[in-house]
């Protein structure tokens, strides 16, 4: 298996949380149904945003592709709208994120539209609508066994941690919320997360600021 060692994918007592009928079967059907409906409803918007980003990004491309760890640590390629240019300084180094973030990109980020292409990841089975966010591959060896339990479910476009602080909480708090979700995954929980996600997006709550395009890196100690 590629990704997280097996020892990191079990609970501290060595026992996995038993799958429920919802977790095992219904959640996937729910994901596919909602993703298809969402793409039919917002497909026109994705095309429009892609056109604007094509020009705003100054040739840097429209989509951002990156390897991320999914369920059981298996690596997949996530797709997002690219919101920054590839502008560099005189020494050839990329400019700080805040300077490369375009006006169009700032709007796309503030409304979380940049995450919508991940509906394709959901249809492919790499992701779920709701689940712990897929983080960087380089974080895998830094997790404690308890933190690594976040990989027992498919990663999500949004999740329990995202509607309870998102970028305003510490990594430790975020991982605790992720593991809580793993143990309490249910239809009503997912519906609540979807509702709170819509509310937070409309309020522009806990979104990265225009001058801070990305959050701090996880080091294993922060």
Where are these regions (language model features)?
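Acidic, Ala/Val/Gly-enriched low-complexity intrinsically disordered segments
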Residues: 2-4
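Glycine-rich flexible loop motifs, especially short His-Gly-Gly/GGXG/HXGH segments used as catalytic or interaction
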Residues: 7-36, 66, 166-187, 197
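A hydrophobic, helix-centered structural microdomain
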Residues: 18-86, 193-222
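An acidic site on a long C-lobe helix of protein kinase domains
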Residues: 25-28, 44, 100, 112-118, ...
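Short, hydrophobic secondary-structure boundary micro-motifs
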Residues: 49, 63-64, 93, 130-132, ...
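Short, glycine-rich, amphipathic interfacial segments at transmembrane boundaries or analogous
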Residues: 61-100, 158-176
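A short, structured surface patch at a secondary-structure boundary
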Residues: 97-154, 194-197, 201
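Cytosol-/stroma-facing membrane-proximal "stalk/adaptor" domains immediately downstream
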Residues: 150, 154-155, 160-209
